[in-house]
């Protein structure tokens, strides 16, 4: 199938970031190119909801702390598209984003080394990948349960079978906020070092077991 005709799924996970999500979601819908937007509400204090036929919000109850690896693995499992566009809830996309990031035998990901300012470094987590390739590497390493290195870990595993290409930062921007909010008050550099060590010691394999959850679909209501 022509890549242009393949079904495109935006996947996102969020915990108490509804203001940023609202700004980002407007840009995702304005693009008109995504076939569906799957959002996992990771036990936000106030349940997320949004009324739009392309938007599917599913809530995980009872999680006291943010875990990107588990939240995004769940979002990916709920997506029906051929191509996954993994966006954080503070990523705004611009016109041309989709047509400039269509993977064949490739995947696209953020590269902080190409950042033109400190804020663009936070686009490192953006990932565009065929769902079959994401599933082949079994998604994110769920042994990494805090912020940092989960993106580098999956990029390293994807590179074993696909060519890595850089996200074009001209078509995406990050909504600025403090690192302390991202890492929930913990030292970011320390977390990255710790999680890199975990990824080496506890390799994530195609046979590694993912977590499972009881999820509920949100009532349709505009936020």
Named regions from a protein language model:
Residues 62-79:
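Glycine-rich, basic loop-to-helix element that forms the pyrophosphate-binding segment
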Residues 7-9, 36, 153:
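Cell-envelope/extracellular polymer assembly enzymes that use nucleotide-activated donors
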Residues 81-92:
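Short beta-strand-to-loop acidic/aromatic patch adjacent to the donor-nucleotide binding site
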Residues 138-156:
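Donor nucleotide-sugar recognition loop
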Residues 152-223:
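C-terminal catalytic/acceptor-binding lobe
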Residues 108-123:
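Short beta-strand-to-loop element that shapes/binds the nucleotide-sugar donor at the catalytic cleft/hinge
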Residues 25-63:
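Acidic donor-binding segment of Leloir-type glycosyltransferases
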Residues 8-20, 24, 31:
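A conserved hydrophobic helix/loop-capping motif in glycosyltransferases and polysaccharide synthases
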């Amino acid at each position: 199938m022509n890549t242009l005709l393949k079904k495109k799924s935006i996947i996102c996970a969020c915990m108490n970031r509804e203001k940023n999500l609202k700004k980002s979601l407007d840009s995702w819908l304005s693009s008109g190119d995504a076939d569906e937007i799957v959002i996992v509400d990771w036990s936000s204090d106030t349940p997320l909801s949004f009324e739009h036929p392309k938007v599917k919000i599913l809530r995980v109850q009872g999680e006291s702390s943010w875990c990107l690896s588990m939240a995004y693995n769940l979002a990916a499992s709920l997506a029906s598209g051929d191509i996954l566009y993994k966006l954080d809830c503070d990523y705004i996309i611009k016109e041309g984003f989709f047509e400039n990031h269509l993977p064949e035998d490739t995947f696209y990901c953020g590269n902080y080394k190409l950042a033109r300012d400190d804020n663009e470094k936070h686009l490192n987590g953006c990932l565009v990948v065929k769902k079959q390739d994401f599933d082949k590497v079994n998604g994110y390493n769920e042994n990494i349960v805090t912020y940092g290195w989960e993106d580098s870990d999956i990029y390293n595993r994807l590179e074993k079978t696909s060519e890595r290409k850089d996200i074009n930062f001209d078509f995406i921007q990050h909504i600025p906020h403090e690192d302390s909010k991202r890492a929930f008050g913990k030292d970011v550099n320390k977390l990255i070092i710790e999680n890199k060590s975990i990824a080496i010691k506890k390799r994530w394999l195609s046979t590694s077991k993912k977590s499972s959850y009881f999820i509920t679909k949100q009532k349709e209501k505009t936020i």
